[in-house]
Amino acid sequence: RPEEIGAGDQGHMFG
């Protein structure tokens, strides 16, 4: 999911 692409970096859409 696009919002989990940067899960290790706060997330792409998590902040």
UniProtKB/Swiss-Prot annotation:
Catalytic activity reported: L-methionine + ATP + H2O = S-adenosyl-L-methionine + phosphate + diphosphate
Any GO BP: S-adenosylmethionine biosynthetic process
Cofactor: Mn(2+); Mg(2+); Co(2+); K(+)
Keywords: ATP-binding, Cobalt, Cytoplasm, Magnesium, Metal-binding, Nucleotide-binding, One-carbon metabolism, Potassium, Transferase
Binding note for cofactor: Binds 2 divalent ions per subunit. The metal ions interact primarily with the substrate. Can utilize magnesium, manganese or cobalt (in vitro).
EC number: 2.5.1.6
Subcellular location: Cytoplasm
Pathway this chain belongs to: Amino-acid biosynthesis; S-adenosyl-L-methionine biosynthesis; S-adenosyl-L-methionine from L-methionine: step 1/1
One example GO MF annotation: methionine adenosyltransferase activity
An annotated GO cellular component: cytoplasm
Family membership: Belongs to the AdoMet synthase family.
Assembly information from the UniProt record: Homotetramer.
Purpose: Catalyzes the formation of S-adenosylmethionine from methionine and ATP. The reaction comprises two steps that are both catalyzed by the same enzyme: formation of S-adenosylmethionine (AdoMet) and triphosphate, and subsequent hydrolysis of the triphosphate.
Other information: On the 2D-gel the determined pI of this unknown protein is: 5.9, its MW is: 43.3 kDa.
Protein name: Probable S-adenosylmethionine synthase
Species of provenance: Zea mays
Lineage, opening ranks: Eukaryota, Viridiplantae, Streptophyta, Embryophyta, Tracheophyta
Gene encoding the protein: METK
